[in-house]
């Protein structure tokens, strides 16, 4: 008799678990879409790198690539935003470009906050619309203090996910120190 009642209870519990999982996945997809749309609206003018430099962004650390991972691209960083200890979806600390056909193309953004500034008033790592930031310790390749970061590939698809650090579809192939970025910037206006 007890087994007769056990099966319906198990089926009800499994159904509730499945519905909860679907609801959570749906909420996460909505948050992801909202964040990507926010990034696109906030950065559409920065497709022109001259607009980015006029807004306080500057070239930082060349083109970042990994041997197996793809690349992170060419970062233009606004130091005032990095140092403010705040996260604002409409004001990313870094804009990510890639040189394609001799032009700088906006491919994504990176939100960055110095860990010491964040940790002074928060107990958990930063999140933005449901996305948890990654921690990068020091020392690091950028020669900056430990920081939290979140990439958003809003302008170029990333088959590994829109919030992963590395994008196999981004390349540093056309990048050479100095002149390639300067020449690409001169030809990037209006795309």
Task: Enumerate the language-model features and the residues they cover.
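Sec-dependent signal peptide cleavage junction
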Residues: 19-27
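Bacterial N-terminal signal peptides that target proteins for export
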Residues: 1-9
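Primary mode marks residue(s) on the alpha4-beta5-alpha5 output face of response regulator receiver
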Residues: 26-191
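Bacterial N-terminal signal peptides
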Residues: 9-18
